[in-house]
Amino acid sequence: MNKKMFPKIYYYDQDFIDIYNKSLSWIQDKVILQKVADRGKKDKNYYSENCDYIDQMQACMSSFFLVYSNGEYSSTSAIDKFYQLQEESGAIRARYDNNNAIIDLDENEENIGFPIFAWAEYNLYHKTGNKKRISEVLPILDKYYKWIESKFLKENGLYSIDVNKIFYKNSPRVDAYYPIDFNSLQVHNAYCISKLADILNDKNLSLEYKKRFFSLKVKINSLMWSEKDGFYYDLDVNENILEIKTIVGFFPMLSEIPSEDRIERMIFYLKSTNHFGTPNPFPTLSVSEPGFSEDGNGYYGSVYTYMNFFVIKGLEYCGRANIAREFTIRHLYYILDTLMPFNKIKGHIWEAYRPMQEGPAYFDSNKKTYTEKGLICYLALFSISLMIENIIGLTISLPDKTVYWNIPTLEIMGIESLSLKKNQTTIICNKGKRGWEIKMESEKLYYFTINILNKKEKTLPIPSGRCSMLLDKL
C-alpha cells in the first residue's frame, strides 16, 4: 500500500509510528468499492467493518480518520448511504444490509443509532472546507433531529430511551430512563446543526437550533448534575438521580454543558485511581462502584476505545488539550501492549480492553466471552485521528486557513504531506545545530498558530514554499 495516501507522521516513539502505519494497511482491507453507473467517474469507495451491512456508528466514526487520506478514500460515502435511505418521517436507521433493507436490532424498536451525523459533518467541514456539502446535508440533519425529537422527547424536556436494550448489553445502568449520554449527544447534535446553519448564513435555522441547544443544556444542568458529587448521572423514571458513576457522565463535555468549575470537578474523577484513572483509562464503570470488574465484564469496567474517543474530544473541546493528550497516550500504549505482547505471540485489536492490565476485556466474565475482535474503525480513531490531533497536537480548520499546533514537549514530531484541500503542507519540529526549530513547506499561504509548552502562543502567516523558525526566537 502507498502510505502517502495518508500523511507521514514524525514522532519520538517508534511504536506509535508503527501502529499508525499498520492502521493504514488494515484500513485498506475495510474499504469497499462500489461501481458507479457513469464510466467516466472513478469508482466510489466506502468504509465498512462488515461486507454484509453498513453500521451508522462506524460510518460516522470512520469519517474522522478517512478525512486524512488525501482524498484517496471517501470520508463521506458511507454516511451518504444512510442519508439516501432517510424515510419521509426523517428516520435513519442504525444498520442496513446490502439490499438497503433495515436490519432489526434486538429490542431496538426504532433501530436508532447515536445522533452523531451532525458532529461528523461539522468535523468534515473544518477538514475539507466543502460548503456545498453543508447545503446538501443540512435539510437531512434537520429532519433527522426532528424525528428523534418526535419519538423520544418527553414533557420534562429530556429524552428517554432504553440505552441498555439499544446500545449497551451487560450494563449496570438498568434503571436509566433519562440517559445522560443520549441527552448529551442530542445537545451536541443541536449545537453542530446550529453551527452548520451559521456557515450557510441561515439565521432562522441557526436560531431554532440554538434554542434547542440551550433548552436541553439547561435541563441537563438542572436535573442530571449532582452538586454533592460533582458528577452527571442518569435519571430514573421519576427523575431521581441514579448514583452510579459511569463513563457516559463525561459526555456533557462535548458541547459546553458544564461550567469551568464543574469541568474541574469532573476531571478529578478521570485522574483518580479510585474512579476512572486506571492504568488503562477509562473504565466504563468507576472503580469505586460495587459492580466494577477488572476483567471488564461488558460495561461493568471494560475500556471501550470508541467511548474513550468521546471523552478525549470532550476534554479537548473544554480546553484541556494536555490532559486529553496524556490519556490518549496511556490508552494507546495498552492497545499496543495487547497487540504486541512481550511474549512475542501476535495479539489482536479488540473492541474493549481491561482497565488494570493489558489484554482484551470480557464481554461476559461468567461465560468467558470476549468483546468483538478486529474492529479497525475504533483503533484508527486513536492511531490516526487522535495521533494527529491530540498526540502530535495539530488542529486544522480549512475554511479559516488555519493550523493550530499545541506542542506539549520538545521532541521530534510533526507531519508530512498533510492535505489542506489542494495545499500539501509539511510541519516538523526537530532539534538542529541552532536549537529546536520548526521546518515548514506549503504550496499556499495559511495561518499558523503555535502554542509552545503552554507558555507562549503566537500566530504567523506562512507563505508558500519552504521556511523555518527557531523556537527560541519565538
Curated annotation (Swiss-Prot):
GO CC annotations, alphabetized: membrane
InterPro entries: 6-hairpin_glycosidase_sf, 6hp_glycosidase-like_sf, Glyco_hydro_37, MGH1-like_GH
Membrane topology: Single-pass membrane protein
A GO term, aspect molecular function: alpha,alpha-trehalase activity
Alphabetical UniProt keywords: Membrane, Transmembrane, Transmembrane helix
Gene Ontology BP terms: trehalose catabolic process
Pfam families, per the entry: MGH1-like_GH (PF22422)
Location(s), subcellular: Membrane
Membrane-spanning parts: 374-398
Keyword check for Transmembrane: yes
Coiled-coil segments on the chain, per record: none
Record flagged with keyword Transmembrane helix: yes
Protein name (record): Uncharacterized protein BB_0381
